[in-house]
Amino acid sequence: MMETYGLFEKLGNARPDLDLAMQKMAEECPEFRLISADVARAGMPEFIKKYPKQYYNTGIAEMAAMDLAAGLAIEGFKPWIYGMSVFNTLRGGEGIRTNMCYQGANVKIIGCNILFPYHCATDPCTCHSSVQVLS
């Protein structure tokens, strides 16, 4: 088991604050869109209830989330993606490179569970791989 030095207990759960921040952005900017790959229901339930027309859930399809966000950005929307860090980068990496970076698409990506040690996996499911892929 990975030693966390009590980090999770010290940090607490930032999801409610993130939910409020996303609601504020949606309220202030009609072009704001939130896209998730099947995790926002747990992390941002109030946003989804309050702004259902500004929320897209691609299911367990990070590449689709990246492609959707890039397309929305190119059309003038302000998309943010919320998903597990490792899957955003490793499963969505080609979409980030080809459809966001090459196109100059203004997309923001929020990675959650960065330090969470997946018990069924090893290093490929922690933040180290995400950082390596994007660097």
Labelled PLM ranges:
Residues 1-135:
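Thiamine diphosphate
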